[in-house]
Each structure stands twice: as C-alpha cells, then as structure tokens.
Amino acid sequence: MFGVYKLKRKLLPFFLSFALIAAIVPTSAVFASESGVAQIGNTVYASLQEAFDAVPEDGTSTTVTLTNNIEMSETSDIVTLEKGKNVILDMNGQSITFKEDTSASPALAGRTIINNGNLTITGNGIIDTSASTYGGYGAIDNYGTLTVENGTYTGAKLANGATIKNRPNAELTIYNGTFDGATCSLYNEGIATIYNGTFKGETCSSCNSTIWSYTIRNQNVNAKMYFYDGTVIGTQGAFSSSAGLAEIYGGTFETVACPIHGTGPAFYALYIAGEVGQVEAH
C-alpha cells in the first residue's frame, strides 16, 4: 500500500506538468510542427498542394498557414492553385525554397506556385528558388489574381526568368516586399498595381549577352502598370515599359555599376519606348 502511494506522489507532479503544457500549447500547433507543412483551421496537411486541393472552388476565402519550411526538389513539387479558389497564404515566417542544383538540365525548373485562382500572400515569409542555378525561374507564376502584402521573393540570376511573372489578363497587386535575384524581378503582361516594395536586378549584358534584363518590365501591348511608390535598382536598367501603359506616380529608380564591368553595360533608370505597338506613359 505504501509503495502504491509513493508512486502516485511521484507521478502527480508529472501529470500536472503535462496538463499545464497541454493547456499552454494548442494541440493543432504540436501536430502541425511534427507531421505537416500547412494547416487550414485545425486540419494539418503533409504538403501545400494537399492544402490547396482542400480549398473549396466556390470562391470562399480560405486561410492556409505554413507551419514548416518547404524544400522542393523536382518539378512535380510545384504547387498549383486552381481557378475558382480563393486563398490567403499565411507564410507565417516560413520559407519555400528550391533544392540546390547547378546542372544545365535541372530536375526542377519553374516557379514555386502557379496561381490560376485568387491568391493573397502575407506573413513575411521567403520564397527563394535561387539555389537552382538554371531552374529557379522565380517565385510566382500568376494567371489569376495575385496580391502580395509582404515577404522576400528571389529567383536565380541565370535562369532567364522573372521573380514574379504576371501573365496576360492576370491581375497583380503588390503592397510591399523585396523582389530580387532573378533575371527580372517583375515581368508584367497583364494589369499590375505597385504601391511599394524594393525591386533589385543584377544581370549584365557584358557578363552574359543572352541573359539580362531591366529589373521591372512592362512587356505586352495590352499590359497596364500603375506604379505609386517603391525602389527599383538595376545593373542593366531599372524600369522598362516597351509596350502597353505605364503610369508612374512616385518612386526611386536607379542604375548601379556591375562589379565586373562597371557602368558600361548600364541602360536607363527609366525607359519608355514603343518597341511593340504603342506605348503610353503618364
């Protein structure tokens, strides 16, 4: 009898401690960190694609929260949000990256997310594909409606892609964030509205005569870009609208020297010209 009583006394503090921890730490958070990378409400998903697949197609706004970092290693890992789905992707300070790959024919080539629906990205996360030298085109390929509230988005300099690519008929709104690393930070063929952000480009035609770009490009006869504020820095050039409509209300546009070839390759900080169709600038 004494032995049993003594055991109970020893176990009592343990059970009290466990109960205290369980009360402080939500059950869903524990499971999310151990067995999944994304969460909708209390439901945990093993992949971001599984979470996107669970979102209703009737336009209901659904928050998907990342609970762990994600590393993609092959093309099948690229995530697609289908038309009709409305997602707020809370990066929750996490990251989505490409696995390191320096081969000329990488196992993974593209951007981490293809958006055909309505996607809002928030939560100050990182989307970085720069580890794949020739396959890390950038972060987001937008065919739908994309809103970026904050975060850091990086592509691979030599992959000949854009960190954010806004396709024809797509709509893009950027409130803030850092966009850099890729051949081009923002390539717009649709409608893009920029309220703030930092856009950096380091490509240089003297370093590579076939892979270089202005940092921001407005590049379609039907493209429309409304730029209210932000900082655009480029080695080859900062902002280019060679087609479509560009309205610039403020911001800083700057060219910087190539660390190898100096200022020789630099084009214009701000370039507006009708290379394709008729260009309007206001």
Regions found by a protein language model. Name each.
Residues 4-15:
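Bacterial N-terminal signal peptides that target proteins for export
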Residues 24-37:
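Sec-dependent signal peptide cleavage junction
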Residues 34-67:
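Acidic Gly/Asp/Thr-rich repetitive segments characteristic of extracellular carbohydrate-active
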Residues 59-63, 84-86, 222, 276:
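A general structural motif
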